[in-house]
A protein has these predicted regions:
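A structural signal for short, hydrophobic/glycine-enriched beta-strand patches
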Residues: 2, 35-215
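Secretory targeting and sorting signals
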Residues: 1-36
């Protein structure tokens, strides 16, 4: 019953806020570069991730709101609204015993690379510990991004986490320390919804958290 009530309130907020965001998005469309992914999906997700209920200190509200979002490879509008303050967060996945990356992690990095190239002012955080052969997930991700043309100074390693919950908690410390205004989490389709719930819970409503699915 409580979940139903929360979901109903979220829907009311979403409907009420959508016209406002549409007006804002229209302004962005005029002033922002043509690369902005402003579509019905990203607009609705943008409402939900901010005033629609996902930016909340209440976990039940976060869970209900996050379930209403559409997982997509399209880039969130928050990146165009504040590129410099939005951090791109790439989540790790278990390495092979020799320290090399599994295909699932390379897929996440390829998706993050597209975001990073389109938004060259956005800082990047690579999150993951669990070392194999002396190499952490974050270390492997950082090396891959640098090898693919991302400047080293854009990348911050969070190399101690061992779970998605720890990814969120540890990365939140970095985001808070640098005064980030929002975060975009990049991970696999079967991981993103849970990851966004964990990150939104960790930031406790301080900043909006959006997501990008790795194909």
């Amino acid at each position: 019953m409580q979940h139903y009530s929360v979901s109903r309130r979220i829907r009311r907020l979403t409907i009420a806020a959508l016209s406002t965001l549409l007006a804002s998005a229209a302004a962005v469309t005029v002033s922002a570069p043509a690369h902005a992914d402003i579509t019905p999906t990203t607009l609705v997700n943008g409402v939900l991730s901010t005033i629609g209920g996902c930016q909340s200190p209440v976990r039940d509200a976060i869970v209900g709101c996050t379930r209403m979002e559409t997982l997509t490879t399209q880039f969130p509008v928050v990146l165009d609204l504040n590129q410099l303050g939005t951090n791109i967060v790439v989540l790790g996945a278990g390495l092979f015993p020799d320290g090399t990356m599994r295909p699932v992690l390379i897929s996440r990095l390829q998706a993050a690379l597209q975001v990073a190239r389109r938004y060259p002012l956005s800082p990047i955080i690579v999150s993951g510990g669990v070392p194999k052969n002396g190499i952490t997930e974050a270390g492997a991700m950082r090396a891959w991004l640098i090898a693919n043309g991302i400047p080293w100074f854009r990348i911050t390693e969070e190399n101690t986490s061992r779970s998605t919950v720890e990814n969120a908690r540890n990365t939140n410390g970095i985001l808070a320390g640098r005064g980030a205004t929002s975060a975009v989490v990049v991970t696999s389709p079967d991981h993103l919804q849970r990851a966004m719930v964990d990150f939104r819970t960790a930031v406790a409503g301080r900043i909006p958290v959006a997501g990008v699915v790795a194909p």
